[in-house]
């Protein structure tokens, strides 16, 4: 998983990171 940055809503980063941290998710 990425430690941040722009994520797609279908990206594993968004599912695992952005949904939890509410960080930069496009």
Swiss-Prot record:
Cellular component terms per the entry's GO annotation: extracellular region
Keywords recorded for this protein, A-Z: Disulfide bond, Knottin, Secreted, Toxin
Disulfide bonds: 7-18, 13-25
The keyword Disulfide bond is annotated on this UniProt entry: yes
Tissues where this protein is expressed: Expressed by the venom duct.
GO molecular function, one term: toxin activity
Localization terms from the record: Secreted
UniProt keyword Secreted, yes or no: yes
Domain notes: The presence of a 'disulfide through disulfide knot' structurally defines this protein as a knottin.
Further information: This peptide corresponds to allele E1i. Has not been merged with other alleles since they may differ due to geographic variation (see strain in PubMed:19606224).
Family according to the record: Belongs to the conotoxin O1 superfamily.
Protein name per Swiss-Prot or TrEMBL: Conotoxin Eb6.18
